[in-house]
Amino acid sequence: MKLHRVVLVVALLLATATGKAQSFALKTNALYDLALIPNIGAEVALGKQWTVSADWMYTWFSSNNRHRYWQGYGGYLTVRRYFGSQTSDLRPLTSAFSGHHLGAYVLGLTYDVEWGGRGYQADHFGFGGGVEYGYALPVSSRLLLDFSVGIGFQDGEYKEYTPQDDHYVWQSTHKRHWFGPTKAEVTLKWVLGKKGGAK
């Protein structure tokens, strides 16, 4: 529950920052949407090339009689530096979020996944972080398509279990120390705010 409070505080800080920020964007990762993981994020421009964002995902699908679980929630906090054109006259709102970008992020995630056989449950948050690279392409005056990948680490503990009748039988507990891809995004980003932004 503590992570929920952290995300709420960050969201409030992002909302407060929009008054001083050049622009503000709401976004969703289409890859998670396709995987039936609803998600939403917010990104705030801090000056002309830096942004900070918070993303949250949550899914809670289950079918006890068929032993199907697709559950999890968590999110990312990310700081980015954009290297795109920051002086676009055609799309002034999206200019702070366009072009190549590098970033650093931290993440927290918990899940319970089982599809009729062995299940995997992380009932406590696993944490990690990494670095990312991406490219954001303006589609219209307010809409961008952002592609990004991240490499980093994730630590945590998870349990393996098997369904037997109406019970779930614990099999083993494992520590996860993962290094590799920890983030992938094809994000639709909708920019809000007034044209011209802060000077």
Predicted regions and their residues:
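Outer-membrane beta-barrel pore domains and translocons
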Residues: L31-D33, M57-T59, Y105-L109, G150-Q154, ...
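Solvent-exposed loop/turn segments connecting transmembrane beta-strands
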Residues: A25-G41, Y58-T59, S63-W70
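Sec/Tat signal peptide C-region and signal peptidase I cleavage site
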Residues: A17-A21
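Bacterial N-terminal signal peptides
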Residues: V7-A15
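Outer-membrane beta-barrel "beta-signal"
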Residues: G74-G84, W178-K199
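Gram-negative (and chloroplast) outer-membrane scaffold detector with strong preference
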Residues: L46-L143
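Extracytoplasmic loops and strand-loop junctions of Gram-negative outer membrane beta-barrel proteins
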Residues: S23-A25, E114-R118, H167-S172
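Hydrophobic, lipid-facing positions within transmembrane beta-strands of outer-membrane proteins
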Residues: F24, L36-I40, W56, Y73-L77, ...
